[in-house]
Amino acid sequence: MAFSSANRPQLIRSSQKDEQFQGSLRGQAHEVCQAFAGAKKWLQWRKEIELFSDLAYYCLTTFSGYQTLGEEYVNIVQVDSSKRKVPTLFQRAALICCHTLLPYFLDKELVRLEHELQIETDGVRLSHSGLSSGSHRRSWMWKWVHRKIAALSEQQKKTLVKAVYIFRQSIAFLRRLHLATFYIKGAFYHLAKRFTGINYLRVRRSIGDDQLVNRSYTLLGAISLLHLMLLLWVQFNSFQQRQEAQQKWKVLRRMSYQRAPPHEKSYKRRAKCTLCLEVRRHCTATPCGHLFCWECITEWCNTKVECPLCREKFSAQKLVYLRHYR
């Protein structure tokens, strides 16, 4: 019996169904952790809980040689690049690592590197910060990184901070570019499957005209590419405007700080925003309890709807401006 390649709607529906079941599994894991370990431990380990939930899901399905619930839902099966054999155990393990472990560790280590650079640039170690809570038990690698960062000049540190930020944005850009390519070519929906060469075959014949569906998705891919180019141009202009606004804001802060009373100055030395690394102005709280400048956090929320420190997801409407906060 000859099998044909899975079409784009099947791959998308399969991924969406898997995400739905993974979200349900994560929610149950969060509830169990909160019930037994408390809210404090849950806040500290919630990213790791999500990681282990995803690993459990894929180990019980893909790694064990079974279809995921999403794949079973649309009647597709995994095959290797030859489309004649099922993926080997090594390929399945590599797929799970690239799909779950790699994004987690990449995001975690980049955030940590960015935080280290900001601390060194500022010259103050925030011992109570959520991101530096494990600084006293650093691994040998991070001790080496810390020594190398300490040896850099201030200008080099600032340049490296920008480079890390651009690299993180480039990862998001690459994902969107890959998605647009999928709409046009229809080969791999996830980057991890492209790296491991895992394809899909459909068990049953799909209902509908594949050529008509493919033309529709090709048009969607072209529109996505155009939108991505426009977004890149807008972000570049926005980045330049932010740089100019940041310089003006630093001048205004310096003038305000020089006019402040001595007792207010001594307090403000401790109250600094971790985004701009300047004295915190117009203090604003996120739902998770972290404090930032109003201008800094609202600007951050224009591109990312998450806390810069703990990565808790929230909408900009949830920000609380703390009037007369001392």
From Swiss-Prot:
Give the record's GO CC terms.
peroxisomal membrane
Which EC number(s) are documented for this chain?
2.3.2.27
Any one Gene Ontology molecular-function term assigned to this protein's record: zinc ion binding
Task: Give the binding site residues for Zn(2+) 2.
Answer: C288, H290, C307, C310
- Zinc finger (RING-type) residue numbers: 273-311
Q: Where are the transmembrane segments?
A: 8-37, 39-60, 90-122, 148-185, 217-236
Membrane side Cytoplasmic: residue ranges: 38, 123-147, 237-326
Protein keywords: Membrane, Metal-binding, Peroxisome, Peroxisome biogenesis, Protein transport, Transferase, Transmembrane, Transmembrane helix, Transport, Ubl conjugation pathway, Zinc, Zinc-finger
Membrane association type? Multi-pass membrane protein
Family, similarity comment: Belongs to the pex2/pex10/pex12 family.
Q: What does this protein do?
A: E3 ubiquitin-protein ligase component of a retrotranslocation channel required for peroxisome organization by mediating export of the PEX5 receptor from peroxisomes to the cytosol, thereby promoting PEX5 recycling. The retrotranslocation channel is composed of PEX2, PEX10 and PEX12; each subunit contributing transmembrane segments that coassemble into an open channel that specifically allows the passage of PEX5 through the peroxisomal membrane. PEX10 also regulates PEX5 recycling by acting as a E3 ubiquitin-protein ligase.
Oligomer and partners:
Component of the PEX2-PEX10-PEX12 retrotranslocation channel.
Protein name as annotated: Peroxisome assembly protein 10-B
Q: Which organism does this sequence originate in?
A: Xenopus laevis (African clawed frog)
Q: What is the lineage of its organism?
A: Eukaryota, Metazoa, Chordata, Craniata, Vertebrata
